[in-house]
Amino acid sequence: EENDSILKQHNDAIRDFSFKIASPVEKWRALQMKGYTDFQLCTQYPGLMIGTGNEHSLKMDDAIKCGFSFDYTTGLPYIPGSSLKGALRACFPGDGKKEEISQEYAAYIRALLDKEDVDIEQLKENIFENRDIFLGAFPVIGFTGKKLLEMEFITPHTSGRFKNPNPISQIKVRPDVKFDFCFILSDDCSEDGTVIVSAEEKKKLFKQLILDMGMGAKTHVGFGHFSERRPIQLREIAVSQPNRTNNRYGQSNRGQNQYNRGRR
């Protein structure tokens, strides 16, 4: 019971912690580094898990079972540049993929670039082996408040280490948190100086790949997906419609009316 109380306090502290330190993005922008660029995307429900494979030392039954990625300098939850680079590289052909699958990935990249004659293998090498730099992604503090984290409980039903169907405690970034995705990019040019794929085209490509494929752990069950716009919250809809008729409990009748219509 004592351990349970301690763990609950720790978990509550994680959930309620308010981040006050700004990310380094504003400083990067102010430096006006050659090739620096960024774009913003919002996490979608149920949120973002990143760095779950990081080492975590607590072994108690109800302790958080997986690690997480926190920036060493600011303490902010973030997507490391290496993770961002790896996730984007996985969207390109090669790296052990079957030939048929690689061809599909190549066609997908060409379609996003709207360039049928681009050499995807050369583009891949130029992006991931040469000059382009992946700085990572940092949350925008104050966009939806300063509380960024929530607890997530997953109940596996598999054999092995977690064979008992007991909930596993994990950390996630909340839905509706805006992230800055940051890069230093350069144009890809032919020998005569003709631009084949510009830095701006790369930026748009990366943005669409993240929107399509997601980022982080458990994307196949909904985590790690982003959108360009923050979803409208139900409470915001309620505020924008103050004249709706409420029932005797102070609750809107709108949902009940829809339910009743559905039963007819």
Language-model features, listed with the residues they occupy:
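Basic, Gly/Ser/Thr-rich N-terminal segments that form RNA-phosphate-binding interfaces in CRISPR RAMP
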Residues: 1-264
